[in-house]
Amino acid sequence: METATLRPTHARLARLAGAYAGTESVYHEAGGAAGETTGRFRTNMGLGGNFLVIDYQQEQFGSITRLVHAVVGVDASSGRPTLHWFDDRGEDPGAPALGDWQGDDLVFERRTSRGAVRLAFGAPLSDGDGLTLRVDASADGATWSPALEGRYRRADWDRRTR
């Protein structure tokens, strides 16, 4: 059986692996209900280290308000990260979004039926225990507004269900 060759991008993705929890500020419906929320991530490298598998949940006022399952890989021809996004809204996930590293941030732009969304995952902070997420939304793909900003620390995964 032939296996894919791991690239330097895979090692960068592996830095994001772990369990995280933290506070989020939600500004726009694309990020959930406006206000303060708690976000939890569980991320791990799967399938021989070829993919970063992300499970995310958002909680507000004691209820789960958002669930996401995402898979980040590497495009074989370009070497760019790819994002496959699935959430509890049941929207057609469409084609994977292509991303780029901007410093320590992994940034994706994806189109949805509601417009464009830009996600920026911040690589763990210098102490290796932190993760950041910024989500911006745009109706026209030109003018962007903050939707969500979160700061997370390594934590036990305490997944609730709804």
Regions found by a protein language model. Name each.
Residues 1-162:
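Hydrophobic small-molecule pocket/channel-lining residues, especially in calycin-type beta-barrels
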